[in-house]
C-alpha cells in the first residue's frame, strides 16, 4: 500500500489543469465537494481515505510537504507495484502487531505508520490481545515460580541450617531472591520451617551479607498479613530487635521497617517488642541522622508508648525525652517532625516524662514549629505544649513562644485557638516575666477579642478568662492590664459570663478576674453599671446554701460540682465584693442587697480563708456608720472578738478593724478597753511591741491598703480554675484549706439563710448542680 508521500508524488504527476484546480481549491476558504477538483474521485487506495489502517493526517503537515516538493518521482507501474506489496503483506502486518513472536527472523514488512508517535489502527487494536498474552505468560510464570519454590524450599531450609557458613550464605541469597517474587514469597511464608530457619540464621550469623539477605527476606514477607503471622509465630520479633544493634545500615532499615509493619498490623507484636527490649534499642537509634529511618523509629515508639505507662517510663529511663527534643530542634523533614511530635504528645501526659521534656527544652523546641505550613504538625505541637505548660511555669526564654501564641489567638481554627489560650493560661501562672511579656505583645487585647469571638464555647472562654485573671494581678503591668480590659470593651462580656449558660469552672474563673479588675478604681463604676454586684451576691447565696445544706445533713467533706467546690465560690464572690466595696457607691449597693447577715454568718466558717474575706468585706462596709450599726445588730461582736485570736494574721487584723470601726460612737471608756484588747491580741507574739504600745492609736479609716492583701502573707494563695494554672499571686486561696485550728466552727449556725430581697428571685438562673464536668484533662488522644 502506498505511503502518504507516494500519493502526493503521484498527484504532482497529474495533468496540469487538474493540478491547477487543486491548488486553486487549496487557496480558497470555501469547502470543495470534489466535483471540480476531483479531490475525492480517485480510487480509495490512492486517495488515502479509504484505508482503515491509515490515520487522519494533520493538514498542516501535508501542506508543508506539498510546498517543499519531492526529489523522487514514481511511474504508474511503480505505484501499482507498491500497492500490490502492501496488499500482499496485510496479513503479515496484522500478525506482527498481535503475535510478533511468530514471524521469521529477518523478515522485513513495509510499515504504514506515518508518524512514530501515533500508532496505526491495527497496532491499537492489538493492544488488548498483547495484554491478554502477557497476563497468560505471567500466570504461567507465577505457577512456575510457585512450583519451583515449593520444590526448592525443603532443600533451602536444610542449607540454611548447614554448619558451613558459605553454604548458609548462598542459601540466604537464594531465598532472598525468591522472596522478591510474589508466588515464591507466598510459598516461603506458608512454610513455618523455612521462616524459622530464616529467623534463626539472621539471629546467629556473623556474616554481614547473610544478615542482610535474611533481614531483607523477612522485610519482604512483612508486606503480607500471612507473612507477619509467620514471622510472629517463628519468634522473629526478638531476632529483629537484636538486629537493631547491627552496625550495617541496610540491616537496620530492614529490621526497623519489619518491626514497624508488625506493630501496625500484628496482634501481640507490641508486647513482644517490649519484652524483647525493643524500646531501649529504638531510643538508642534516635542519634542516627537518616531522617526517613528516624521517622519510622519514632513512629514505632509512638505505637509502643500510646496508652502504656510502663513503656513511657522505659523511654524516660533510656533518655528518650532529650533525644526527641533534639530531633525537634535539629531537623526540618516534615514527616519526621510530625512523628516525633506524636511521641512527645503521648509522653506529655505522663507526670514523670513531663518535667523531663520541659527541662530538655521541649517548650522552646516545639514552639519553633508553630508557624509551619503543615497543619498536622502545628496541631500536634500545640497539643503537646498544652499538656506540658502546667509544668513549665518556671521556664526561662519563653519570649518567642509567648509572642507566637498571642498571634495564634487570631486563628480561624478553633482547635488552634483553644490550645493557644490554654497554654497562655498556664504559662502566665505565677510567672511575672511571662505576664509582662504577654501584656507587652498585646495579649490583653487578643484575649479579650478571643472571649468576644468564642461566644459560649467554654473550652475557649475558660482558659482565656484564666489567662486574663493571671495578667491582671501582681506584676508591674497589672494596672495597665486592668485598664486595658475595660478599654478594649471587655467588661460587658466578662460580667455576662457570670450568667447562664456558664458552668461553674468558668464562673469561678470569671469571679477571680472581676476581683482583680476591681483593684483598678476606674473599673468600679463600669462593673456596677454592668450589674456585677447583684450577680456576685446571687452566686454567693447559691453556693452558701449548698454548703449549709450539706452541713445540716452531717456531711464533712467538701462537695465538687463540675469539678468546683462550692466553698471556692463562696470565697471568690466574697473576695470580689470585698474589693468592690472600696467604692462608696458600691458599698451602698452591697448593703442594699441585705448581705450583712450573710457576711456575719461566714465569720463562723471552718475555712480560714472564708473567715478572712468575710471580715474584709465587713471591714469595708463598716466605714459607713449605718452599716457598722447593722453589723453590730447582727451579733458580729462575738465572732469578731473570737477571730482576734486567729493564727491567721489577715483574719485577726480585719476582725480588729471591724471592731474598732463599730466602736467609733461608743463611750471613751469602752474604746479604751477595746484598744487594750485589740493590742494584746494583735501583738501577742511580740512582747517588745506590747511594751512599746500602750494604745493601738489606729486610724482605721486612713489605713487603706494596710488592710488589703499582703504579699508576705503566708496564707495568701491563688484563686484558680482547675487545670488552667494556679496563680498564687492572683485571687484569694480556695483550695486545700486547713480545716482545723482555733475557730468558732462549733457555733456555726445552720438554720437557713437571710432574705436577700429581689436577688433571690433570680436564683433559678444559676447553673445546675449536676451538669457535666468541663475540667481540663490530658489524654493520649
From Swiss-Prot:
Family: Belongs to the beta-catenin family.
Stored SMART domains: ARM
Single biological process term from Gene Ontology: dorsal root ganglion development
Residues bearing the modification Phosphothreonine: 41, 556
Processing after translation: Phosphorylation at Ser-552 by AMPK promotes stabilization of the protein, enhancing TCF/LEF-mediated transcription. Phosphorylation by GSK3B requires prior phosphorylation of Ser-45 by another kinase. Phosphorylation proceeds then from Thr-41 to Ser-37 and Ser-33. Phosphorylated by NEK2. EGF stimulates tyrosine phosphorylation. Phosphorylated on Ser-33 and Ser-37 by HIPK2 and GSK3B, this phosphorylation triggers proteasomal degradation. Phosphorylation on Ser-191 and Ser-246 by CDK5. Phosphorylation by CDK2 regulates insulin internalization.
Gene Ontology cellular-component annotations: adherens junction; apical junction complex; apical part of cell; apicolateral plasma membrane; basolateral plasma membrane; beta-catenin destruction complex; beta-catenin-ICAT complex; beta-catenin-TCF complex
Tissue and organ expression note: Expressed in cerebellar granule neurons (at protein level). Expressed in the intestinal epithelium (at protein level). Abundantly expressed in the tooth, skin, lung, kidney, eye and brain with weak expression in the liver and heart.
Function (record text): Key downstream component of the canonical Wnt signaling pathway. In the absence of Wnt, forms a complex with AXIN1, AXIN2, APC, CSNK1A1 and GSK3B that promotes phosphorylation on N-terminal Ser and Thr residues and ubiquitination of CTNNB1 via BTRC and its subsequent degradation by the proteasome. In the presence of Wnt ligand, CTNNB1 is not ubiquitinated and accumulates in the nucleus, where it acts as a coactivator for transcription factors of the TCF/LEF family, leading to activate Wnt responsive genes. Also acts as a coactivator for other transcription factors, such as NR5A2.
Entry-linked InterPro entries: ARM-like, ARM-type_fold, Armadillo, Beta-catenin
Region of interest (Interaction with SCRIB), residue spans: 772-781
Effect of residue 8 to P: Loss of interaction with VCL
Subcellular localization(s) per the UniProt record: Cytoplasm; Nucleus; Cytoplasm, Cytoskeleton; Cell junction, Adherens junction
Biased composition (Basic and acidic residues): 734-745
Phosphoserine PTM sites in chain numbering: 23, 29, 33, 37, 45, 191, 246, 552, 675
Modified residue annotations for S-nitrosocysteine: 619
Modified residues (N6-acetyllysine): 49
Residues that carry a glycan: 23
Name of the protein in question: Catenin beta-1
Annotated keywords: Acetylation, Activator, Cell adhesion, Cell junction, Cell membrane, Cell projection, Cytoplasm, Cytoskeleton, Glycoprotein, Membrane, Neurogenesis, Nucleus, Phosphoprotein, Repeat, S-nitrosylation, Synapse, Transcription, Transcription regulation, Ubl conjugation, Wnt signaling pathway
Main localization (coarse): cytoplasm
Sequence ranges of the ARM repeats: 151-191, 193-234, 235-276, 277-318, 319-360, 361-389, 400-441, 442-484, 489-530, 531-571, 594-636, 637-666
Positions carrying N-acetylalanine: 2
Pfam families to which the protein is assigned, alphabetical: Arm (PF00514)
Coiled-coil regions, chain positions: none
